[in-house]
A protein has these predicted regions:
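Alpha/beta enzyme core
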Residues: 18-27
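Active-site pocket-lining/capping segments in soluble small-molecule metabolic enzymes
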Residues: 1-15, 19, 33-129, 136-557
Length: 557
């Protein structure tokens, strides 16, 4: 275990109210990443509790409450709560009778979150960290979004007002866009939050189709178009994707066209574009080139201090240290010889060692000692390269010098009512299982309104772990999936655990075996074996309030 490692609570822990934040503070965590559905009013109060608060501010969001989506695991056997979401919410759905929705068939697909204009409210509240979704996004996307937020933060602390310019907003939309909303964070309603028409990147509209002939589409542009831009024509039964490899204007091949120009672009015919359809730009090569130039001109480099020793009869030695105290030392394979003619100068050593090549470092301080020696540049370069490589390894490894630490949990063992589901081949043994009714605490309790007055209760999240319940069992919504999680919940007062519905028989057996081997007794555990499974907890109703049931096009849902 790592007693000095800072602990952060993931959004998948479904911490969405003040009692959850208070509980995790008392557990010694450094930071809580709140559920993405948490409104600003609760965030403001959470920031006063005395633990760092991190909030989602930009990027893809889920329609289900954070940590409460079982649809991906149910349909694709991939846990959305453990980083393997199959994105079932981005699929097409119809009513059970097969009829379609007038707003679009992507009824579960939300727009992306973008609260850049609301940033002062979050900073005023005391939020410590802004979380920006960037999984599987290109580096240019990360650069542009981070640059935008960095500029906004700097303006805020300069006591000025920041608004995203129309040009920057356009750039963000070109990078990735399926609509923006303020989400639940600032109380956008369901019509403002959903992207039912399309679930994927739509970019910006740049023109309208005039005609299609012989593998070319004629378009009147409303914005700039550059050669090799990525394009999409909104079409049915699916959109037409293309690249502006060849652009013709007045029968001449050009590499750029501007608003109001009429151009022909080579275009696939499946499906063939029709007059009046909208042309959208999904990749802007001009923007990407600008970002690449910015990244090269203003690289983010890590400052280093460097020392060297160049003494006769010893290996050449280089020591580097970063601002966080990581240190690396490298020595040459050969021994330094005394100079027979002109000795290498310290200026030459400094010039050679100051080059960092492909490593993201900047030498801000360099000094050392050198005698009258012969030292080839190749040896200086190789020793410097080794030192930087070792520093890379040191920075990527969390090192603790505290020695082996004991690890112990005070488990609430209840031996007279122990119950275990044992999986042997295809049989299930329910001997000694007790069957009784238990009250299930609300999965969503933002305002801490629910007061427990029951002796037997199913708790829904860590927000309910307060050691005041007489007899509580962790419900499937807590998504407990390994022996350590079981032990922790039992140590906090739970008398039993219902395994996550994402787990199969073999996974349950492995968790129980590991628990028994580690702690020496069999925990009281349950598993859902009959009844309808809740696959999503959604904060409010669909856009169509008359919807009672939906189905996907593959009859899996």
């Amino acid at each position: 275990c790592y007693p000095d490692m800072p602990v952060h609570c993931s959004t998948q822990m479904h911490i969405h109210n003040l009692k959850g934040v208070e509980f995790m503070k008392n557990q010694g965590v450094e930071r809580v990443v709140l559920a993405r559905e948490t409104p600003i009013e609760i965030i403001q109060q959470a920031c006063q509790i005395g633990v760092e608060i991190e909030v989602f501010t930009y990027g893809a969001i889920c329609i289900s409450y954070s940590g409460q989506c079982m649809m991906s695991a149910s349909v694709k056997n991939r846990s959305a709560n453990r980083g393997m979401c199959a994105q079932c919410c981005r699929l097409k759905y119809t009513r059970v009778d097969g009829s379609h929705f007038k707003e679009g068939d992507y009824i579960l697909s939300p727009k992306d979150l973008n609260v850049i204009d609301q940033l002062p409210s979050l900073l005023d509240a005391g939020v410590s960290s802004l979380k920006i979704e960037g999984r599987m996004k290109r580096s240019e996307y990360v650069y542009l979004v981070i640059k935008t937020f960095r500029e906004a933060i700097d303006v805020y602390y300069a006591n000025k007002t920041y608004h995203v310019s129309s040009e920057r907003l356009k750039q963000l939309e070109e990078m990735f866009y399926r609509g923006f909303s303020n989400g639940h964070l600032f109380h956008d309603d369901v019509t403002q939050r959903m992207s039912q028409y399309r679930p994927n990147h739509q970019g910006i509209a740049i023109g309208k189709v005039l005609a299609y002939r012989n593998g070319r589409v004629q378009v009147k542009l409303s914005d700039n178009l550059y050669q090799n831009d990525g394009l999409r024509i909104i079409n049915e039964p699916h959109d037409t994707g293309l690249s502006a490899i060849k652009i013709y204007k007045n029968d001449l091949l050009v590499n750029h066209a501007k608003a109001n120009d009429i151009v022909w672009i080579t275009c696939p015919s499946d499906p063939a574009p029709k007059k009046g359809q909208i042309l959208r730009k999904t990749t802007d090569t001009h923007l990407l080139d600008w970002i690449h130039a910015q990244m090269e001109e203003h690289p983010r480099l890590i400052p280093l201090r460097m020392k060297y020793r160049a003494l006769t009869g010893q290996p050449f030695e280089v020591i580097v240290e970063d601002e966080n105290g990581h240190v690396a030392k490298a020595q040459s394979d050969s021994i330094i010889e005394k100079a027979k003619n002109a000795a290498v100068t310290q200026d030459k050593i400094v010039r050679s060692l100051s080059k960092t090549g492909e490593y993201p470092y900047e030498i801000v301080d360099i000094h050392g000692e050198a005698e009258d020696i012969f030292l080839p540049v190749s040896i200086m370069n190789e020793t410097r390269r080794r030192a930087l490589q070792l520093l890379d390894e040191a920075r990527s490894t969390y090192r603790i010098n505290a020695g082996k630490q004991p690890y112990h949990l005070e488990l609430c063992e209840n031996t007279d009512v122990l119950s275990r589901i044992i999986y042997e081949s295809s049989s299930v043994d329910f001997n000694n299982s007790d069957i009784h009714h238990m009250h299930h605490l609300d999965v969503i309790d933002e305002d801490n309104k629910e007061k427990n007055t029951y002796s037997d209760v199913l708790i829904s999240s860590v927000c309910d772990l307060n050691n005041t319940l007489d007899h509580c069992i962790a419900s499937p919504t807590m998504n407990l999936a390994n022996s350590y999680a079981l032990a922790y919940v039992l140590s906090q007062g739970a008398s039993g655990v219902v395994f996550s519905s994402e787990m199969d028989n073999e996974q349950i057996k492995q968790a129980l075996d590991a628990f028994t081997d580690r702690y020496g007794f069999v925990p009281k555990t349950y598993r859902l074996v009959y009844g309808k499974r809740t696959v999503m907890y959604i904060k409010d109703r669909f856009v169509n309030e008359d919807i009672n049931a939906i189905r996907d096009l593959n009859d899996l849902i």
